[in-house]
Amino acid sequence: MKKLVLMAVFALSVLVASAQPRLFVKPNEPLGEGKGIHPGRVAWVHSPGVATWDGETSLWVEGRWNDQQKADAMVRQAVMTVAGAKSPKAAWKALFKNFNKTHGKGNKGYKKGETIAIKLNMNNAITHRDTIELNSSPYVTLALVRSLINDGGVRQQDVIVCEPSRAITDSIYDKIHREFPDVVFIDNLGGNGRVKCEYYPEQIKYSVDNGKMARGLAKCIVDADYLINSALLKTHNGPGVTLTAKNWYGATDINLMWRKNAHNGISPDKRKGKPGYKTMVDWIGHKDMGQKCLLFLIDGTYGSRHVNGAPAPKWQKAPFNNEWCCSIIASQDPLACDVVGMDLLIHEWPEFGSFNYCDEYLREAATIPAPATGVTYDPERDGKPLTAPLGLMEHADADRNYTKLELIYVKQ
């Protein structure tokens, strides 16, 4: 393992200004308040060789293209770095205790019988068959489950791997079920060892009239004691990026076929940057979504410039140098986690037009109770609006430096 000074790693050529997207927040202008044991800390673990698919042969999920040992080490290192602990066991203990302390449950750790739901991003899976399209990595998911059980002391039957709106593919189910047969799997289809997702209606009522946006939430999400948001590192034609905040959409009672779903309040005004209510702020601030999350994780072992299809292309700029991103980003702070992922994507593909104003949801969430839109964010519509920033957001400068956000880069 090798820790490198970020400025040395990212000695990059200056990009042409016109190629840069228009954003609401300038570099090194932090907004909000950091969350976590170490407020605003983000772990970036980079392990070249964890993903090696050639982009053409068969499916990227096959074992010959992925290194499980590296994935295991990455997840354990990410958890240790976020918690500031010397072992994965100590890290999980610290994370559970910090969560419970900040949620009014006392200074205690994980207790047997408490359930932990891991929300995957299987947006490109509508059957249980493996696909060439990019979804949650079977290797990162197994690594996360292994660490929770073997390091965190969580019982198998208390771990729920879920994707309420899509299908959990065979490569994920088979790999985990073979090793941990009591882990529960819940997806949109059910069958083949998976439990079909059920929903509680009218759980998220939104802070404004949000049209036909889904308002039900998966029972496995609502009933869990803790959540882990395991997202992907991808661009998106609508909101610009799809990271941990967008991943919550899949916890609502949307249709398996995405064209049948509403997407109100998700995308920014890409042409003029006119401020507008952002649905993702309600998801981050909801008591049974972002506010119940123990850990935010972005799986960037492949990473992609495309929301659909196979992962592509390989990453060209340093430190990737024509390889896959081979990275995991993790934090207790939902805004800090997403802004680091966003900065990585923007740095690699600055010409992507949908990046314009993609940071609006982060600005809104970081400036509660006085966001630029003037919206009073009250996700449950219970008359108890959010009264404080939901985290810390700050864009890096050209040398990948932050001033308040603490980014720790670890190369393995």
Regions found by a protein language model. Name each.
Residues 1-4:
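Positively charged n-region of N-terminal signal peptides that target proteins for export
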Residues 6-7, 123:
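General helical structural elements
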Residues 7-14:
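Bacterial N-terminal signal peptides
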Residues 15-19:
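Sec/Tat signal peptide C-region and signal peptidase I cleavage site
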Residues 20-112, 123-131, 135-412:
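Extended, low-polarity segments enriched in aliphatic/aromatic residues
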